C-alpha cells in the first residue's frame, strides 16, 4: 500500500511527492524502495502488487523499474485501506485463487531484516494451512501514543496468539497501562491471509464493498481492469481494514514479533528513532550547531551544503522543504495537518 500523502510529515512530505518516495535516511533508497528490497528476499518480483494513487504511477515505476505497469493498481481517489486491500484481493484471486498474501504499508522501517524475513515466512506458512487472518504485532518497548494496539488472550497455536481486541491510539496514561499489563502489542499494519479467507471476511463483514467490487468480476487481471474499477471506485466505503474487518472477525491471530520495527508516521517517531540519547538533538540532511538547545529535530531539503544554528529552542520540529519552513513544538505535532490545511486554503494549494 503506497498511496498516502503522509501529511503528518509536512512540509517534507508533500502531495506531489509523499514520504514513501523520499530518501529520509540519506541511503540512496526511498522508503518504498527499502520495502521492496526487504520483501524481494521472500516474494518473487512478479508477485508484487502495488496499490497507489493514480497520481503516483510514474513515481512508482521510476523508483521500482523491476515492476511492470500491470503490477500497479491505481486508485482514482483515496478511500482508506479496506477498498485498497479489497481491490488487490480480487485482482490476486483472478490470477491465483489459492494465493497467500502479505499486506504491508510502503513506509515502515525494519532494522533486523533477517528476523523480519523469518516472521513473514512463518506467517505465510500458517495462513496456507489455517483459515485465519494473521497480523504481525510488535512487542512494545515504551508507552507509545502514536500506534494502535492489539490485545491478546492466552490462547496460542504454534507461536500465534488469539486476538482479543484492537485498540486505537491511546493517550499516554492508557499507553502506560497497556505496556505494564503485558497483554498488548503494537499494531504494525502488516497482516497475512489466504486469498479466499480474506474474501470470505470481506463478504461477511463489509458487503457494501464486495457488492461494488463484484460488479467487476470477469475483468480483474485483464487489460480493462483499471477502467472498470475506476468507474465504480468512488462508490466504495471510505473505511480502514481494521474497522471494517479485523475488529469484527473472530478468526484473527497475531504473531508477536520483535525485529526493530518503526512506523515512520510522524516527526516524533523519526526523532525517537534517530536520537542518540534522551533530549538529544537530531539533524537530517544538514549540518547543525546547537546552543542551549535540546530535544529538537531538524530536516532541511535543499541542494549543496547547509548549516542550521539553533539557540535557546527546545523540543521543536524545524523543517524546510520546497518553499515552506515549519517550526513547531514536538508536543503539538498533531496540529501539523491543521497547519497544512490552513496553508492550502489561504495560498491556493501552492504548499500542499
Kindly give the residue locations of the regions a language model identified:
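Conserved N-terminal catalytic core of the sugar/cofactor nucleotidyltransferase
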Residues: 8-15, 26-105, 111-115, 121
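Short beta-strand segments
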Residues: 1-2, 51, 102-105, 135-139, ...
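Residue-level signal for inorganic ion chemistry
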Residues: 32, 88, 107, 150, ...
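Left-handed beta-helix
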Residues: 195-352
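General beta-strand structural signal in soluble alpha/beta enzymes
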Residues: 50, 73-74, 103, 134-138, ...
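Conserved core of the sugar-phosphate nucleotidyltransferase
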Residues: 113-233, 253, 330
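Short coil/turn connectors at secondary-structure junctions
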Residues: 45-46, 68-69, 96-99, 129-133, ...
